[in-house]
Regions:
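Active-site groove signature of glycoside hydrolases
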Residues: 125-143
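Alpha-helix N-cap and loop-to-helix initiation/capping positions
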Residues: 46-50, 76, 80, 108-116, ...
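Short, well-ordered coil/turn segments that N-cap beta-strands
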Residues: 26-31, 62-64, 88-92, 130-134, ...
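Short, acidic/polar
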Residues: 45-58, 113-127, 174-176
Length: 331
């Protein structure tokens, strides 16, 4: 948990300064912005101009890393990100993803065929209003297409200048190694938060060995760890959480002790629960860059409020001891 290996740098391209980290050789702000919620993944419909303003506000607050995907919307998130960052495109890094059958009207079907990847990339470039993608992910491993073939396409796209770095999302250690051997990966994305720690044992050793960065999505536990959700919350069917075991009425009630623990530690550190949850992640490894998402300007300000305060090794151990006493439901 030492900070000694942390690449301490500052982002001087926006009005607020934020520490930067490296995903292999890709330098980004220590926190990125996940741009999935703004297209209604958790219910609700959001005004385009409001979301453009939110993305630009994130940049003003020091965020230089924006995460999207062709399947978000579909297409809408990429379009909004592209329009929002156009005035300062060269000052930010965009991560997007391919791997689902969006153009075939099958957004849940996996598709990483080489010809499909190329069409997806051309579409993303157009929607993002750019000539290159800073970080291109395979959204999910396609069992019908060898990862070595996907990596080969990534190598070609890199040589063509259409993408600068590539990554994988929700990939196993074995797939990561196979792909990395063909075209070195810069980042792997997976769910990771205080209450979801599988990556620590499944892929962290591989990432550390190969020098690959890690980009956790849902670092705030889909808002559960922020303290705004209690055991009485119920989710509309349009909200993705309505289908998740961790958000059933029984699980919410059962898991409330974790919220209490996070609140206690947040108070102890003089931060909000959301800030503590991000602080916990940033303190784990120097090569982790979480991408919380939000549709609310006030919440955005909260997320970027603490990016250079860390937990000590002793504090991490103390928190984990207390956490280990809580049995979670729905995991």
């Amino acid at each position: 948990f030492s900070r000694l290996s942390l690449q301490i740098d500052r982002n001087n391209n926006s009005s607020n300064m934020m520490e930067c980290r490296k995903l292999k050789d890709l330098k980004v702000s220590s926190i990125g912005l996940g741009c999935l919620p703004m297209v209604g993944y958790y219910g609700g419909k959001y005004n385009k101009q409001d979301m453009l303003a939110l993305i630009r506000r994130a940049y003003e607050k020091g965020i230089t890393f924006f995460d999207t995907a062709e399947v978000y919307g579909p297409y809408l998130s990429e379009e909004w990100v592209g329009e929002a960052v156009a005035p300062f495109r060269n000052e930010v890094k965009i991560g997007t993803k391919f791997g689902f059958g969006v153009e075939e009207k099958e957004p849940t079907a996996l598709n990483s065929r080489p010809d499909h990847i190329r069409r997806a990339v051309e579409g993303s470039l157009r929607r993002l209003r750019t000539d290159h993608i800073d970080l291109l992910y395979q959204h999910r491993v396609d069992p019908k297409v060898p990862v070595e073939d996907v990596a080969g396409v990534m190598l070609d796209l890199m040589q063509e200048g259409k993408k600068l770095h590539w990554g994988m999302s929700e990939a196993s250690a074995r797939s990561i190694r196979q792909a990395h051997a063909v075209c070195p990966l810069s980042a792997v994305q997976s769910e990771y938060a205080i209450w979801w720690r599988e990556p620590e044992t499944k892929i962290f050793p591989t990432l550390e060995e190969l020098g690959i960065g890690f980009v956790p999505y849902c670092p705030l536990g889909r808002a559960f760890l922020t303290g705004v959700i209690d055991e009485n919350n119920r989710f509309d069917k349009s909200d993705r959480r309505a289908t998740l075991p961790r958000f059933t009425p029984e699980a919410l009630k059962h898991n409330m002790p974790l919220v209490v623990l996070v609140r206690e530690w947040a108070k102890r550190k003089g931060v909000t629960p959301a800030q503590f949850s991000l602080m916990w992640i940033l303190s784990r490894k120097s090569w982790i860059v979480p991408i919380p998402g939000t549709t609310n300007l006030d919440h955005l300000d909260d997320l970027v409020g603490v990016t250079d305060v860390y937990l000590t090794a002793c504090e991490m151990e103390e928190f984990d001891r207390e956490y280990s006493k809580i049995g979670l439901m729905g995991h």
